[in-house]
Amino acid sequence: MAADPIHQFQITKLFSLGHIGGQEIAFTNSSAYMFAAVAIIAVMMLAPGRQLVPGRFQSVAELSYEFVANMIRSTAGKEGLKFFPLVFSLFMFIAVSNLVGIIPYTFTVSSHLIVTVTLAMLVFVTVLVYGLAKNGLKFFKLFVPSGVPIYILPLVVFIEVISFFLKPVSHSVRLFANMLAGHIALKVFASFIAMLGALGVVGWVGAVLPLGLTIALTALELLVAFLQAYVFAILTCIYLNDAIHPGH
């Protein structure tokens, strides 16, 4: 079981919260790590206070704030800043969850499709509801690109509509697949090192290469943890821009 690269993604019940309609509601390891991620973010954002000379936590909080704010301005304009709480929350939650998941014997929340689909659907519904509320029927200009010849316009509109409703799929699967693949690769290399080490001195020598690869892969996963949070957030900003400026 220890060498099984899939075992690390297993959701286990920690305790039961009761039953609703005959269905048990349980607090799982996934729930625990979601709460842990939120707690870490709360400590980072609230604990430092406001100091003239910022400490480590305050510096991280301020850098994260400015990074996300600049991201929104560059993709959705100043009007997009009204969605700052949403984008910032998504970015921080995904980044912290990904980083926590790199620690051995922890759980990676974003490696489960149900989590990433939920986050992507939150963005999709926000875009759809706000776009219709703000623009009314003008929101449907999003599906009619300018400059398209009239004889292929129906086909283009059909493709645009399908593409729009498939956005939550690509938005969620990208994060899920990257985190799943990365952690499986780490587990495979780590298990290989353990098996070689069990062979004695000869195995230790042979384990040098996979150990180096594991270290390099871990460093890459640290980069991917931030990169995937950034990609999810920047795509959120792009989708929000479609709702704010559907005719552009």
Swiss-Prot record:
InterPro entries: ATP_synth_F0_asu, ATP_synth_F0_asu_AS, ATP_synth_F0_asu_bact/mt, F0_ATP_A_sf. The chain crosses the membrane at residues 25-45, 83-103, 113-133, 142-162, 192-212, 215-235. It is a multi-pass membrane protein. Gene3D superfamilies: ATP synthase, F0 complex, subunit A. It is found in: Cell inner membrane. One of its GO terms (cellular component) is proton-transporting ATP synthase complex. Pfam families: ATP-synt_A. Keywords: ATP synthesis, Cell inner membrane, Cell membrane, CF(0), Hydrogen ion transport, Ion transport, Membrane, Transmembrane, Transmembrane helix, Transport. One of its GO terms (molecular function) is proton-transporting ATP synthase activity, rotational mechanism. PROSITE patterns: ATPASE_A (PS00449). Belongs to the ATPase A chain family. Key component of the proton channel; it plays a direct role in the translocation of protons across the membrane. F-type ATPases have 2 components, CF(1) - the catalytic core - and CF(0) - the membrane proton channel. CF(1) has five subunits: alpha(3), beta(3), gamma(1), delta(1), epsilon(1). CF(0) has four main subunits: a, b, b' and c. This is ATP synthase subunit a. The gene is atpB.
